[in-house]
Amino acid sequence: MIESITSFGAATFGGWWPLIWTLVRAVCIILPLLLCVAYLILWERKLIGWMHVRVGPNRVGPMGLLQPIADVLKLLLKEVMVPSAVSRGMYIIAPLMVLMPAVAIWAVVPFQAEAVVSNINAGLLYVMAISSVGVYGVILAGWASNSKYAFLGAMRASAQMISYEIAMGFALVTVLMVTGSLNLSDIVNSQNRGFFANHGINILSWNWLSLLPMFGVYFISGVAETNRHPFDVVEGESEIVAGHMIEYSGMAFALFFLAEYINMIVISAMTATMFLGGWSAPIDAPVFNWIPGFFWLLIKVFLLLSVFIWLRASFPRYRYDQIMRLGWKIFIPLTVGWLIIVAIWLVSPWNIWK
């Protein structure tokens, strides 16, 4: 289907077609992403409500389904107040610097075979590079706000993101070692091989089982990277109110939250791609194979996002020193140790990734 669309477009628009096709693919990513963020927030409020034995949002529309629309309209109608003491240019550009990397990562995330905006061979390297850029927007927001609370939150955010970026990087290196490719589509395809895949049990051939410690480290580090509970000391309400966002209001404030929820979806999608077989069905059987791969990826992302929400409802916020200790004294040594084990495993006679 995609090949027929591209051939028709090339014949119709000529030299303009590559630009038009890129814009169409970008719109097809951004608009559903915004819709997913809106209803992810509703799902979060509903799920936490059920866990707290409450009802959750149920007033706007049937069963509260229009609540995200009401929230967006409320934020759009609020005035963006710019305090007089801030560095105006950097204050305004900081939310965009946080949001743009979160959106840019989706250029290389494969939704199913051949369904990717840009199927580049260095996709994994691209993800690691772009995901580390968002911290600059957070630091800029804290510094430009000219507030001690905002600056303290920005310093916490930068230290926390840098600390857990190392563990996430080592976890992804192990995936690179066992797959031998930086292309995300190749990483998904490489998980459907081996003893279990040959017998139709794809779920046991995915990387989550053979790289179980890396799977846990990557996902938990992703929770810390997104400053989500229980790692949300960056915006600890009882200490520094809203952290680096304290001087923001209206849509400028909303852009930070939009970036946070997009990053949650990014971490879930990358975890599903790296460790849970991406768009692959768990069992190689006709009853599963007729379902498009996109829906399998969607189910995995939804379950991982629900784990994000479950963590928020179940765990208390960690102290800042506990967060740093977990990253530097547990996760980094664990990932380095497992990296060495995988390297030895690959050259041994018991290599299961051949």
Curated annotation (Swiss-Prot):
Keyword annotations from UniProtKB, A to Z: Cell inner membrane, Cell membrane, Membrane, NAD, Quinone, Translocase, Transmembrane, Transmembrane helix, Ubiquinone
Cellular compartments annotated: Cell inner membrane
Pfam hit, one: NADHdh
Source domain of life: Bacteria
GO cellular component: plasma membrane
NAD listed as a keyword: yes
PROSITE patterns: COMPLEX1_ND1_2
Membrane topology label: Multi-pass membrane protein
Top EC class for this record: translocase
Membrane-spanning segments: 23-43, 91-111, 124-144, 162-182, 203-223, 250-270, 291-311, 330-350
Gene Ontology process terms (BP): aerobic respiration
GO-annotated molecular function: NADH dehydrogenase activity; oxidoreductase activity, acting on NAD(P)H, quinone or similar compound as acceptor; quinone binding
Known catalytic reactions: a quinone + NADH + 5 H(+)(in) = a quinol + NAD(+) + 4 H(+)(out)
Entry's EC annotation: 7.1.1.-
InterPro entries noted in UniProt: NADH_UbQ_OxRdtase_su1/FPO, NADH_UbQ_OxRdtase_su1_CS
Family: Belongs to the complex I subunit 1 family.
HAMAP family on file: NDH1_NuoH (MF_01350)
Subunit structure: NDH-1 is composed of 14 different subunits. Subunits NuoA, H, J, K, L, M, N constitute the membrane sector of the complex.
PANTHER family, per the entry: NADH DEHYDROGENASE SUBUNIT 1, NADH-UBIQUINONE OXIDOREDUCTASE CHAIN 1
Chain's role: NDH-1 shuttles electrons from NADH, via FMN and iron-sulfur (Fe-S) centers, to quinones in the respiratory chain. The immediate electron acceptor for the enzyme in this species is believed to be ubiquinone. Couples the redox reaction to proton translocation (for every two electrons transferred, four hydrogen ions are translocated across the cytoplasmic membrane), and thus conserves the redox energy in a proton gradient. This subunit may bind ubiquinone.
Protein name per the record: NADH-quinone oxidoreductase subunit H
